[in-house]
A protein has these predicted regions:
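Preference for extracellular/luminal or secreted protein segments
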Residues: 25-59, 63-75, 288, 309-614
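Active-site-adjacent structural elements in enzyme catalytic domains
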Residues: 91-110, 140-158, 356, 361, ...
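Active-site mouth loops of central-metabolism enzymes
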Residues: 56-67, 133-146, 228-242, 304-312
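Short glycine-enriched loops at secondary-structure junctions
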Residues: 61-65, 113-122, 162-172, 212-218, ...
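Second-shell residues forming the walls of enzyme active-site clefts
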Residues: 48, 84, 92-109, 119-121, ...
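Short acidic, glycine-rich surface-loop motifs adjacent to enzyme active sites
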Residues: 54, 73-91, 175, 250-273, ...
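Bacterial Sec-dependent N-terminal signal peptides
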Residues: 1-26, 31
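Catalytic domains of carbohydrate-active enzymes, especially glycoside hydrolases
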Residues: 71-87, 150-164
Length: 614
């Protein structure tokens, strides 16, 4: 064998070996299972009973009462608290608190986040949002789902989170669901399973543990478990074909955690015990029948679906959840009393030490997998230098815009045969660039909204995002060879039919009117923010005026506006987020082709389906 070829083979093998080692670094367990297991065993031998029990708890701290918070967190740290969940707080103080707590902790804390569309879900004035899951369910290109999961996972890891309680793999086949809805990938169980797995794999490849929720399935309910107890009245065959299918698939694909919902499912537990407290649902089904060996956590135990509906004392609820097979007890109401309850239960033999050690070992192995064990205090510190600028990544902003471009739905686009004005015969009403229009008007339907963005010192209300639509449309028009006259009217706050009618009267001479409805709501109980009188008024005017509608809200709008084909065009833009406003303008003008599909059935349109080959 020639020497040069031999050297090439040696170098190639060396390179492949290095690549394999580097690729294995994010998953320490897979790379060095014996060493990690020995490390975990060594830690467990030094832990007291109270410290082992405290490892089961993940709690929530807020900054409203700093002295009391500090006293409580210090007491819990001394007891060996397992982890924290950060939500509804300010980013920098949150991360500084984690650094302070880890400086005191014998075992590093598992830092977790409930961030289905990224950290912005909890730090909503400081970090750009990604599209919500139902919007991702409108994208046909599966690679984009993985990319979204990877970007969110990387964002979480860079901010110091080891676990993100996402994705939501509930199958939303109930349009009246008040709490899942836009958090689901859609109504097709196979699509929810595949997209959930792609999102999960992206997150975990980026170094953040994912969590499939809310087992055994919260999609086909019309009750919010934050407020009461939803009931799934279905038989086992239906549950296995719909609700359980995504969980089974994500378990097969290696999801790190599964979260239990607070639900009543008598087909799985004939006693009607709440799912988060049910041995048959957790141990018999999730562990034994579905074969899940990862970490099982509850949904927040402070939610009324279990805190009130169980009828148990608050400190007893975590004990019952643990006895049923749970590993992580999330956000109980009485943490210290709950720890004591489980300690006493172990001492009196109600819970075996083996059962306790099983959960503690799983939690410590998860911490090892995410690089928490065997690191010094300084290595564990989250770098907060320039954090507010670091969370606004140009590559994430570009990805978010791409996701929006691919997800908006052209629900209706009529054919219009106007020779002399169109560049094509029998042309669709949109895009605008194919028409020789003289005057186009944008009529913005804007409500009152809360602040949703505070980036680089500028405060934005969510309703002000209409500016992104209008400005993008204006830029595209101004950059064309034959721009049309573009004017705008904004209807703000409490809008009457008279105000709307007057605005339309003033636009009688315009070739085309684009109506942007920016004040949509997510609540089915509030009719998704739809004013039926106003929509019918717009539809009547569309008989004599060329009116296209951009609905910045849910696809379920088609259930409420069955006459949407009375308009020249009807675009579903999912939400009034800034990125959706920009994408809508690109589609209206013709810079981007509309390619989003229906993730759910609504009106006369069925959810998009294909063979996902699961």
């Amino acid at each position: 064998m020639p020497l040069r070829f031999l050297l090439f083979v040696v170098l190639l093998l060396s390179t492949l070996s290095t690549m394999k080692a580097n690729a294995a670094q994010p998953n320490e367990i897979a790379a060095q299972p014996n060493e990690i297991a020995a490390k975990v065993d060594s830690i467990m031998r030094r832990m007291s009973l109270q410290e082992r029990v405290a490892q089961l708890f993940v709690v929530h701290f807020v900054s409203k009462h700093p002295r009391r918070v500090k006293e409580l967190q210090n007491r819990l740290i001394k007891r060996g608290l397992g982890g924290v969940i950060l939500m509804d707080d300010k980013l920098l103080p949150s991360l500084e608190r984690i650094n302070a707590m880890n400086a005191l902790a014998k075992i590093p804390l598992l830092v977790t986040l409930d961030g289905e569309w990224g950290a912005q879900m909890r730090y909503w004035t400081e970090i750009p949002a990604f599209p919500k899951q139902m919007q991702l369910g409108s994208i046909k290109d599966r690679k984009m789902i993985y990319r979204a999961g990877y970007a969110i996972g990387k964002e979480c890891k860079d901010l110091g989170f080891q676990v993100n309680y996402a994705p939501d793999v509930d199958v939303n086949n109930n349009p009246d669901n008040p709490v899942i809805h836009y958090r689901s990938f859609g109504e097709d169980p196979q699509k929810v399973a595949l997209y959930g797995a792609l999102f999960m794999q992206g997150m975990q490849d980026a170094g953040t543990s994912a969590c499939a929720k809310h087992f055994p399935g919260h999609g086909d309910t019309d009750v919010d478990s934050h407020k009461s107890l939803p009931v799934l009245p279905f038989d086992i065959k239906r549950l296995e074909e719909v609700e359980l299918l995504p969980f089974k698939y994500l378990i097969e694909k290696g999801v790190d955690l599964v979260m239990l919902g607070h639900l009543q499912v008598k087909a799985m537990d004939s006693t009607g015990t709440i799912s988060s407290l049910s041995y048959p649902i957790i141990t018999d089904w999730l562990k034994n029948k579905l074969g899940f060996e990862g970490v099982i956590c509850t949904d927040a135990l402070e939610m009324k679906g279990v805190a009130v509906e169980s009828g148990l004392p608050q400190s007893r609820i975590p004990l019952e959840a643990f006895k049923a097979g749970v590993d992580i007890l999330l956000m109980p109401n009485e943490v210290e009393a709950s720890i004591k309850q489980i300690v006493h239960a172990v001492r009196r033999g109600e819970i075996s030490k083996e059962r306790l050690n099983e959960s503690v070992r799983k939690i410590l192995m998860l911490k090892a997998k995410r690089g928490l064990l065997g690191r010094g205090k300084e290595e564990l510190r989250i770098d907060t230098t320039g954090i507010n600028k670091r969370v606004i990544r140009p590559e994430n902003l570009a990805l978010i815009d791409s996701l929006a471009n691919q997800s908006l739905i052209m629900a209706w686009n009529s054919r219009r045969n106007q020779l002399g004005k169109s560049t094509m015969i029998n042309q669709r009403a949109l895009p605008l660039k194919h028409w020789r229009y003289g005057k186009v008007a944008y009529l913005g339907y804007v409500g009152e909204g809360r602040i949703v963005q505070k980036l680089e010192g500028s405060v934005k209300s969510n309703v002000e995002n209409f500016e992104h639509f209008y400005n993008t449309l204006k830029e595209l028009n101004n950059g064309s060879q034959s721009p049309f006259q573009l004017d705008s009217i904004l209807l703000r706050g409490t809008i009457t039919a008279e105000m709307l009618s007057s605005a339309l009267d003033s636009l009688q001479g315009y070739d085309c009117i684009i109506v942007g409805i920016h004040n949509a709501l997510n609540s089915p109980a509030k009719n998704f923010g739809i004013n039926d009188e106003h929509m019918r008024l717009l539809a009547r005017r569309a008989r004599t005026q060329n009116i296209s509608v951009v609905w910045f809200g849910t696809p379920y709008v088609l259930n409420k506006v069955p006459f949407y084909k009375d308009f020249a065009s009807f675009i579903i833009a999912h939400s009034n987020a800034d990125f959706n406003n920009r994408a809508a303008a690109r589609i209206v003008y013709g810079e981007v082709e509309p390619c989003g599909v229906m993730p759910v059935s609504a009106g006369d349109q069925k959810a998009y389906k294909e063979d996902y080959n699961l």
